[in-house]
Amino acid sequence: LRESVNPPVPAARAAIPVADIATRATELSNLLVTLTASAAAGANIGSIAKMLPDMSEKLDRQLAATTKTLDAEPSLDTLQSLQQDWQRRELATKGWLSQLTAQAIKLEEALTQLGDLQKTWGSTRAAAQETKAPDPILQQIDATLTAITVAQGKIQSERTALLELQSRVALEVTKCSTALTQIGQVQDKAVAGILAPDLPPIWQPKLWADALTA
């Protein structure tokens, strides 16, 4: 029998030496500014949020019109035209979704980084208190931990809004996929009808009866 291997226990975050706390706190302050700035929704994401309601309404109307057209058994040329239209719409909505996903990943990474920093500074606070560091040092550590918490809140808020927008865009991608699936099914049916032989199969009982009585 193979021996079970327990996962390694994560090492505790190393505390920052007291002599380095002031410098590291300044560096962290600059990092927090950078992280929160990069987490804010950019112009592209703002445009997506602004255009999405109109896009959603248009896709609803176009999907209803496409369904009606498909019910009328359109020609293969019409089906191909519909397919190309929906492929363009799908490409556009997937492009939006890709941008939102990239930003969501960036926010996840920022939150992970902040979580690690919070642990490091938490360990630093405990170590500084244990070694009876001067009050100004403890106050600086506390201010740094507060700044990390504030940054986490801002980025988490951006992430929540982004994920909500991402879900709404995903619904529009689904509409396009639904339309393309329906079009493909009707295309297959139309092609099968074209390829079906006009003559009745030779195994029809009536044909054999007619041949035997001829």
Model-derived features: positions:
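Flexible, low-complexity extramembrane segments of multi-pass membrane transporters/channels
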Residues: L1-A214
